[in-house]
Amino acid sequence: MLGLVATLCFTPAVLAALSREKPNLAGTWTLAFADVVHPDGTRGHDYGDAPKGLLQIDAQGRYSLLIFDSARPRFASNDKKTGTPAEFETTVLGSSAHFGTLEVDAAAAAITFRIEGSSFPNWEHTQQVRKYELRGDVLSYRVPARANGDVPVSEWKRVANQP
């Protein structure tokens, strides 16, 4: 009898439904890498060899994401209002920050970021969908291809010992 119950409980439909459960992404994540896959299949580092970043997601899906190239040079003047054009360029291209809400579609393996504020103003009040993969405490996703065909890929590791 127990075998029959187990068989009925784990039909393909039930297993498929279980696999579509929304994963719990709430918590703090640190950036493992922020790479870019070029159209020819080669891979590069989008934010330098040792990027740093933090992704925080609360239980309601509000998030804040920060990525920085750790090799960004300091401003010679020590004043962000008087930087040179080259200093401003490396600052903008060496960082990415946005916040808002996110939603997970487990069946489509997609995360939708509803961006409320961003270091790149063109992203504000937009929605961006990224294909994701969650393996234990490792979250990775692919950003839609840029105009030149490059595909940014980010991987995050959940910070241990969170409540």
How does the language model describe each region?
Residues 1-3:
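Bacterial N-terminal signal peptides that target proteins for export
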Residues 7-163:
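Lipid interaction determinants
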